[in-house]
Amino acid sequence: MSIDRLLKAQKQENLEIVTAILDDGSKPDAEYTIEHHFSSTNFDRLEKAAVDAFKAGFEVNDAEEMELEDGSVIFCFDAIAHHKLEVEMLDKACEALLVLAAKQKVDYDGWGTFFIDEDGNEYIDDDEYVDDDEEFEEKPVH
């Protein structure tokens, strides 16, 4: 699929996700942690994408190895940004990251964030509060 088609689909998904999160009552003016997901079967390509994302101003976490259901292995990392949950900002970031992914021949797998209540607390799901002082397995809303 061309970058233009991918971007058009991603922009539609951005709008749907932001609308759903805010309609569920997530705090509209909070600063969100946005995790943009990348993956590849080629570690070297993924590493180059991580360097490019870092140079573009994103925080980048360490690459992880994951085994898929079919037994194959992929590598993945997140490029992380912190900002309000605004569709326009997400659209710009997604466009830049889709171009980066195409350049490095890796997959951009969308983004995720957490629900934030009126008190500014992040939630993994409806009843699991994220305590920054405790370790937890992250499970973004999307």
From Swiss-Prot:
Disulfide bonds: none annotated. InterPro entries: RraB (IPR016716), RraB-like_sf (IPR036701), RraB_dom (IPR009671). One of its GO terms (molecular function) is enzyme binding. NCBIfam families: PRK11191.1. Belongs to the RraB family. Interacts with the C-terminal region of Rne. It is found in: Cytoplasm. Globally modulates RNA abundance by binding to RNase E (Rne) and regulating its endonucleolytic activity. Can modulate Rne action in a substrate-dependent manner by altering the composition of the degradosome. Keywords: Cytoplasm. This is Regulator of ribonuclease activity B. Its main location: cytoplasm. It comes from Shewanella sediminis (strain HAW-EB3). The gene is rraB.
